[in-house]
């Protein structure tokens, strides 16, 4: 289910102080990057991903990451994407 504007605003506030946990390198979005993002989302639910110069532009890379991990793209600010995926069990974000 897509996030509402209010939920996105709250997640942006929570993600403001986070550091990027995954960095997309010059090879772009690969299966290894998607696996790393998937694991980070499972561990943290809300993560930042730094997107460096690569074969695709930052919008394409962020969308590919969101689709590849079934996550919601909360925000794309510059080269940093904020992704959210709620855990099925034991989630810190029950209202989402």
Label every PLM stretch briefly.
Residues 1-96:
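Positively charged, polar, low-complexity stretches
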């Amino acid at each position: 289910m897509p996030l509402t504007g209010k939920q996105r605003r709250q997640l942006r506030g929570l993600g403001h102080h986070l550091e990027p946990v995954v960095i997309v390198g010059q090879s772009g979005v690969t299966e290894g990057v998607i696996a790393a993002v998937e694991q980070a989302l499972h561990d943290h639910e809300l993560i930042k991903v730094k997107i460096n110069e690569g074969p695709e532009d930052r919008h394409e890379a962020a969308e590919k990451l969101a689709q590849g991990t079934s996550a919601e793209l909360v925000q794309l600010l510059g080269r940093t994407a904020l992704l959210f995926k709620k855990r099925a069990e034991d989630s810190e974000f029950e209202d989402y």
